[in-house]
Design a protein with these regions (language model features):
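Amphipathic alpha-helical interface segments
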Residues: 1-144, 159-380, 396-494
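Long, charged low-complexity segments
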Residues: 147-150, 154, 384-391
Length: 494
């Protein structure tokens, strides 16, 4: 019988009204962690693994719910694509926490649970477990796009890949269909974990604490104050509504510029009768890649801030705000680097190498930006914090990381993240002016070099034409030579 998934309309309705559900999931997570921490070391491993899966599912639902609420609250095309990417990344990261990929699947929570079920030898439980396992394997192997997860959470050395993948997300319906499939599997898993929980309590002698558990809800409560301050009576929201379409057009223009550079490179490689080197072309591609990185940062931050301003609870606000850490870290890894290895291969290192040595204005601005970037990296714990906010499963220790992830979300300081955003915007402002001047300078130098090179090569062609015309070569050879020289001249004059 064909499986019946929840309809897209049903999912959309649930998401639109999920503000309370997000808070309820947060409360359920905190209560479960409090109960487990109150149990002594005799807690059965079956109970521990079952609740690792249960809390993982709750966090996944909460995380996806936050992105979906933001998705349905905006009408801007780029912003929708940003949240669609995050829905897909959350599905991928959630699946990774439960079933994992490749060789790491051996240590996945669902497979660790299988080891426990084999020991208790309950045919009904094992049968139900195996049915869900087959669904998970099919979904993970055939429905998840791991590339979009990586490009969303890490960006890429070649930002044009991020652009192409982002531009390909044109259908909310396709993403919602995928979510419906995943949602259905999660619901089956929830039912199964509830059944296992009852079985464990009935058959292992586990007794949950009867006394009232002291649950600490540690999420930062300053979000409403910060939102009021930064929005400044709606001015920030209005500014975002202006920035998003303008910045999206600029992103598209820069991507088209990058594509044109690639076409020129391809044409020269395929059509030139001899090897022609244009180092300036490579420099312009590096600058275009850098520009794409910075523009993605600005657009992604604007999308996050808008979602943050529309958050209805502190936990929803914190879950949105954690994207700032992800965006900042992803940008700085590629732009500047947090260690020697990253800095050596960074975009900034490449840019520094072709700043004209005699342009004091550019060199002074380069140093000012360098100082800002260096300070931003030196004073941060971004990479560790980012990892704690994203990864729900620790591949190294083969254990759930959901509790640590939630704690990281809770302690996010909105005031500090606001300062981080302002610093990133200041860097963007200076970078934009700097790269524009550098591109103009390189283009001017390239024109001058091209003109000088053209004159030199055209003089040689003229000399060769004169020699062949004055020679005793046959008319056919002369005609063939003229055609070849014409073709070379046309390429030179491109």
């Amino acid at each position: 019988m064909e499986r019946q998934y929840a309809s897209i309309e049903t999912i959309a309705s649930l998401i639109q009204n999920s503000d309370k559900a997000i808070e309820e999931l947060y409360i359920a997570l905190k209560q479960d962690f409090a109960i487990r921490n109150a149990l002594d070391e005799s807690m059965p491993h079956l109970y521990s693994v079952t609740h690792d899966i249960l809390t993982g599912i709750w966090f996944i639902l909460m995380d996806i719910g936050v992105s979906c609420r933001a998705l349905f609250q905006t009408n801007y095309a780029y912003e929708k694509r940003f949240h669609l990417k995050n829905v897909l990344a959350s599905i991928s990261e959630g699946f990774k926490a439960i079933m994992n990929f490749g060789k790491s699947r051996k240590y996945a929570l669902w497979n660790l649970l299988e080891e426990e079920l084999i020991q208790i030898d309950n045919a009904d439980l094992i049968d139900s477990f195996n049915k869900i396992k087959l669904q998970l394997i099919e979904f993970g192997d055939n429905r998840i796009d791991k590339d979009i997860r990586d490009l969303t959470l890490h960006y890429d050395d070649a930002m044009i890949k991020v652009f192409e993948k982002t531009a390909s997300l044109n259908s909310e319906e396709d993403t919602m269909k995928l979510l419906c499939e995943f949602w259905a599997i999660l619901q089956d898993m929830l039912k199964f974990t509830y059944t296992l929980d009852e079985y464990t309590q009935a058959n292992t002698g586990l007794t949950k604490p009867n006394e009232a558990i002291n649950v600490q809800f540690d999420v930062n409560h300053d979000h409403n104050v910060i939102k009021l301050l930064i929005d400044n009576k709606g001015k920030l929201e209005a500014a975002i509504s202006t920035v998003l379409p303008k910045a999206t057009n600029q992103l598209d223009d820069m991507a088209n510029h990058y594509f044109r550079l690639q076409k020129i490179r391809k044409y020269i490689k395929e059509e030139a009768p001899f090897n022609i080197e244009f180092p300036e072309l490579n420099n312009l591609e590096i600058l275009a890649n850098h520009d794409l990185l910075i523009r993605f940062m600005v657009l992604d931050l604007a999308s996050v801030i808008n979602a943050y301003l529309h958050s209805d609870s502190d936990i929803e606000a914190s879950l949105n705000l954690r994207r700032v850490v992800v965006i900042k870290t992803s940008t700085l890894v590629h732009l500047y680097g947090y260690d020697d290895r990253e800095q050596e291969k960074s975009v900034w290192k490449s840019i520094q190498s072709f700043i004209p040595s005699d342009d004091e204005t550019l060199k002074a601005e380069e140093q000012a930006i360098q100082d800002l970037l260096s300070k931003l990296v030196a004073e941060s714990d971004d990479k560790r914090l980012r990892a704690s906010l994203v990864h729900l499963y620790d591949n190294g220790r083969h254990k759930s990381n959901t509790e640590e992830t939630l704690e990281g979300v809770e302690i996010l300081d909105p005031a500090r993240q606001t300062v981080e955003i302002l610093l990133l915007m200041e860097i963007n402002k200076r970078m934009e002016a700097f790269t524009k001047k550098l591109m103009d300078t390189l283009a001017q130098n390239a024109r001058l070099q091209k003109e000088a090179s053209q004159r030199e090569m055209l003089d040689k062609i003229t000399f060769m034409r004169q020699r062949i015309e004055q020679s005793n070569a046959s008319p056919d050879i002369k005609d063939t030579f003229r055609q070849m020289m014409n073709k070379i001249q046309n390429i030179i004059l491109l």
